[in-house]
Structure formats: C-alpha cells, structure tokens
Regions:
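Short, charged, surface-exposed loops that flank catalytic or proteolytic processing sites
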Residues: 458
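Redox-cofactor-proximal catalytic regions of oxidoreductases
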Residues: 45-89
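Flavin (primarily FAD) cofactor-binding/catalytic cores of flavoenzymes
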Residues: 2-45, 52, 90-250, 254, ...
C-alpha cells in the first residue's frame, strides 16, 4: 500500500491585518499555482483581521487613510469601497474615513470568503500564542504558550507593531495600577476612572484616539511629548498624489532632505497643498531609504523621524475636528515636556514634569506607540530568535533585518531558514512599512516567495467556488 505524503504546512504567526492579508494571499496564490498545502493562522485572538489596530469597537476611532486607498488586494483598488456598500450599509465615497472596526470586519470576512472559494490550500486557525521558533534549513518547530509543539515547512512572522516598552516610565509609576501601559490591550481604557484628570504621554495618532475615548465633562486631558507636535490632518477632499521628480542627486541625508523639501514647496505653489507631494513619495520611499548609508539612516531615525511621521501619518478630518473642539473647550492641553517622576497622592498620582510643572491626575496612559528596536521589548518569540541568531535587528536597530522579499536575515547575514516577516518588523529596511497600502503588497510578495520554497506538491485542485460574500463585492456587482 502506498501512503500519501503529508501536505506542506505554512505557519502565519499573528492574525492581525498583516497576518490576515498574508493568509489571503497564500490561499489565492496556492490555488492559482496548483500548490496543495495547509495554511495555519496562529494567534490567540478569537477573530482574525482585528489586531491592535482594528479591534476597537468605538465608532469614533477612524481609519487614518481614506477608504479608497484601503483595499486588501493590490490588483483591485476598489475592493474595500465595494465591500462597504455591499456589506456595511449606507453610501461610502473613496475619500471617506470610516470606523476602524469596519475594516477589521472586512478583513475577517475577506479571509473567510477566500478560504471558502479557493480550495488548493486549507486554512486552519489555532488559537494559541507562539513563544519560540527553532529555525532549521528545511523545517521550523514552533512552541506555543500552551506547551504544544508543531513542525511546519515555512513560517511568516506577522507580529504587528512591537508591544510597548516605554523607557520614559519612572520607577514610581512602573508598577502602579493607575498607569496604563498599553491602551489597546483588552479592557485597558475601561480601567480609567470616570472622574479626575488624565495624562497621556505621547502626542501622535494613538493619543488622538485615546483623548477622544477618555474625554468626560469636567475632566482635563493633558497630552505631553518631547516635541509637543500633533499629527497633521488630511484634507476632507484629498487631492491626487503628485509624483516627485527623479531624485537621483547625492545619496546622503542632507541632499535627499533638500530634494524632498523642494518637491513639497513646488507642489504647494502649484496646487496650494503640500500633501499630494508627500503622498507622491509613497511608491519610492523604500528605494530612497535604501540609498542612505547606515549612519544616515540611524541619524534620521534619531533626529528626523518625528517630523516625518507627523506629516506622513495624518489625522482623519473628523478626528482632527474633535481634538480642535476639546482644545477650544479647555478639555485637552498639548505641550512639550517629559515626565520626571510620579508618586501616589490623594487617591491619584502627582506627576512631576520638566520645567518645574506638576500635575495631579487619576491615570497616566502611555501613548508613545510601538518602539522600533526589538531588543527593547519583553517578547519571548523575538527574544528567542535574536538570542539564537536566527534573526538580527534591522538597519538603525529598527525591526528585523530582511532580504528584499522579506526573508529574515540571521546573525551571519545569509538567508537560510524558510522564515519571512512583513509589516512593522521591516521598518528598518523600508522605513514605511506599517500601513495597509504597503503591507498588502508585501503580503503578496511574501506569499509568492513562501509557495516557491515549499516541497513540490502540485496536484489537481478543486474548481474554485464563488462565495456569497465574494460575489457581493465582485467588480461590477450591483451597488
């Protein structure tokens, strides 16, 4: 009797946006190539597609990118807007900024519909956390928080932004129950008392969402960061991107900065707005970043990143208007400064800031966002990979170092194990690697590379079945 060889197994570690998009691409491309395999989505979360970004249920938490740019499929830019019309009710325009919860639902439905329609690969969702991965030349052994082990032929780390590891937190605050380390952890904002002022450390996009969520009558929300800079805002009617001129001057940071500023100024003179110029840089950002020397990259990450981010990653117009209203009413203050110390006082916290200022607050919430350096976070999987030399930090210490197709580079520098990553983990190599327009393209590239690496298992596959969800959002479907 001849036994049937087991199907190759691909692990996707993480079921947020990056992991879900990768699983979708693996299922679609495996079907197109006739590759039989098992795709294992590994994450303790009950539903795929949500992750830290899209698990919020607050309808005031909006996407920071217009709906027309948020399709999950690179080849079908209207896919998300068709889904909104077909599945979310109401009428949506490409320029609308919709609730993030809707996008999480969209990703979940897309994955379910893809698994139903494309049958060459089989999707399995294991609700467990991967805490270690022993990478070999042909087989990866995963260890889970539950103690279980599993062997796979290839793995994709879709870990999302690094967990908070704020270096700014003084000793008197670190273990205090009134300090919220991660505002997106389950139930974190529910711990904020109904009364008393609140200090938010960080003035970026996270702060904007948290300020709206914790606002109460009679409360002042204080937002603090070293620069005091708030993100710029999108226009309600975004203009199309303006392509930059050929930026082939000196490959140093100073020369590139001059060229980019000239592009912004020229675009502003021509159309009255700098935003289209910055949006036009999106397709070439990774190439420009790759031209810089290691020293210039490190210098930019240290000195220039914040100014770039406040212009590049902008607020939805509605969110910006809410912040304006809170500031005008005296319910939100924004200032530059740093936390020096904190101590319990009168049932709350007395927080000492630079400049001799003190605040009395009920809660302090870290809104500084994800750190860049994986060596600074207490993540068991990342710690194991780095300690074992199966991975190394990316340029400037940001993320993990990868080859051009997202394959992890070990300490020795030559890709060996069939182990890939995408999204936030590639910031050191690409700079811009956290938004869906970048991640969806990376997911397609990673899926293609993974499938090419699998042991030959091409067999006849069932004819794709068209699911009800897929039909409802097909091009040309009734609106």
């Amino acid at each position: 009797m001849t036994g049937t060889a087991p199907l190759p197994r691909v692990a996707v570690v993480g079921a947020g946006a990056a992991g879900t998009l990768t699983a979708v691409q693996l299922l679609r491309q495996a079907d197109r190539r006739g590759v039989r395999c098992v795709v294992e989505l590994l994450d303790p979360a009950p539903l795929p597609g949500r992750g830290a970004a899209y698990r919020t249920t607050d309808p005031r938490h909006l996407l920071n990118v217009p709906a027309g740019r948020m399709s999950a499929l690179p080849e079908d830019p209207e896919h998300f807007t068709r889904w909104l019309t077909a599945r979310a009710g109401g009428t949506y325009r490409p320029g609308d900024f919709v609730p993030r919860a809707l996008y999480g639902r969209y990703l979940g439905e897309l994955l379910a519909g893809t698994a139903q329609r494309y049958r060459a690969a089989r999707l399995v969702h294991h609700h467990d956390r991967v805490v270690d991965l022993a990478a070999g030349p042909a087989r990866q052994v995963l260890r889970f928080a539950s103690g279980a082990h599993r062997g796979v032929d290839a793995a994709v780390l879709a870990l999302g932004p690094l967990p908070p590891a704020p270096a700014w937190v003084p000793a008197g605050l670190r273990a205090d129950a009134r300090f919220v380390r991660d505002p997106w952890a389950a139930g974190a904002l529910e711990r904020v008392p109904e009364h008393g002022d609140v200090l938010l450390v960080g003035t970026g996009l996270t702060m904007a969402d948290v300020a709206v969520a914790v606002d109460r009558a009679g409360r002042t929300v204080h937002a603090l960061s070293r620069t005091g800079l708030l993100p710029e805002r999108h226009r309600p009617d975004p203009l199309p991107p303006v392509d930059p001129p050929v930026l082939d001057g000196p490959g140093d940071l100073a020369g590139l900065r001059r060229a980019v500023l000239h592009h912004l100024a020229t675009t502003r003179r021509r159309c009255g707005d700098w935003r289209p110029a910055l949006d036009g840089l999106r397709p070439v950002t990774a190439a420009l970043w790759g031209r810089l020397s290691p020293a210039d990259r490190a210098r930019f990450l240290r000195d220039g990143l914040r100014a770039w981010e406040v212009h590049r990653h902008r607020l939805a117009p509605e969110t910006a208007a809410r912040l304006d209203a809170l500031r005008a009413a005296g319910r939100l203050t924004v200032r530059a400064g740093e936390v020096l110390d904190a101590a319990p006082a009168d049932g709350g916290l007395r927080v000492r800031l630079t400049g001799g200022r003190e605040l009395r607050v009920a809660t302090v919430i870290d809104c500084t966002g994800a750190p860049l350096d994986p060596r600074t976070v207490p993540d068991p999987l990342l710690g194991a990979l780095l300690a074992r030399g199966a991975a190394r930090p990316g340029p400037g210490g940001a993320g993990l170092d990868t080859s051009s197709d997202g394959r992890l580079l070990p300490a020795g520098g030559r890709p060996g194990a069939p182990l890939w990553t995408l999204g936030a983990a590639r910031r050191g190599n690409l700079l811009e690697s956290t938004a869906v327009p970048e991640i969806r393209c990376q997911a397609a590239d990673v899926a293609a590379a993974v499938l090419r690496s699998l042991p030959g298992r091409e067999r006849p596959v069932p004819t794709p079945r068209r699911s009800a969800v897929d039909h409802a959002i097909a091009p040309g479907a009734p609106r």
